[in-house]
Amino acid sequence: AYLPVEEYGEFEYKFFFTNTVDSTYSKGKIAYVGKSGGSYTVSNATVADGGTGVEDEITNRTPVTFGGETKKDVKPDESYTSDTVTINIPEGHYLVWEWTVSGKGIPCTKMATLTSTTSSSDGTQFNYCDEIPLPQLIGAKRNVKHTLAAIGDSITQGCQTEQMKYEFWASKISTLLGSDVAFFNCGLGWARASDAVANESWLSRVSEYDTVIVAFGTNDIVSGKYEGKKSTAEEIEGYLDTIVSYLTEKGCDVILFNAPPQDFKEKNEAVRTALNEKIPAIAEKYGAKVHYGNYETLIQDEQVELIY
């Protein structure tokens, strides 16, 4: 997997994994929030310098270990973090993650054009695959003035954009904020606010950051809670209230997004409108900020000031 880095140069990295599904995918037939992963084994893992793109040679492969060992047996619902690994990623280059895992029911990340990811069942012929197990969090040891996280669905994750272009709003704001701010994108395709409420592990990861952007609503309106019906505006309001309450209790500043425009039919559009009318009251209740309008306006200078 070719992964863009936030800051170039030599840094100490750690990689976090959880063997539990963070959020419901599609209707939940294959994966749903809280589903336990199966037992699997990590045979080896490396990070490397991927050059400026997939046509470049992969160099500087560096082993990743877990408790001092290259091999790790992972149990269902286990969360774990790699040992520290130091690697230098030059300007404009990608960090490449490579590993060999064996088992069944391993939670994966649906990348969907975000980056180049390939897989092979026998290590010979590698083909494009946007459903592969990856670290849920990649962290580098850096001196920063502020930390920012975003939790939401595919609009936050960025999987609707052209492959490896990184022109979605979260990527743009990360670039605009510069090296003084560390940004963690916790968006997941198909995610609902109800998923975040049901999975404290996922929500707790973003609670460690100074400021958290909360951007849910679309999939709650379209699909609703896993094993449930489409959510009403009042139900989504309740989920968002729980999320913002949790984050503010943890000491986070919260920026709450409204539900963005979509090609909704009349009934769903009515839910979106009703939800957006309720969001300011949630923000006022907990001292959060609200971002109105489309996502592009967030990268304007006056909107970036919200983060500080």
Report each predicted region and the residues it spans.
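A structured beta-alpha segment of the ubiquitous adenosine-cofactor-binding alpha/beta core
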Residues: H291-L306
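Conserved SGNH/GDSL esterase-like catalytic core that processes O-acyl groups on lipids
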Residues: K145-A150, I155-D241, D263-E266, V271-T273
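A short helix->loop->beta-strand "cap" motif at the edges of active sites that frequently abuts
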Residues: K250-V254, A288
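N-terminal secretory targeting modules
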Residues: A1-I151, T156-Q157, T161-Q163, E249, ...
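N-terminal Rossmann-like NAD(P) cofactor-binding module of classical short-chain dehydrogenase/reductase
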Residues: I213, I307-Y308
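Substrate-gating cap/lid alpha-helix
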Residues: P261-N294
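Generic structural signal for well-ordered alpha-helices
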Residues: L240-V244, N276, Y295
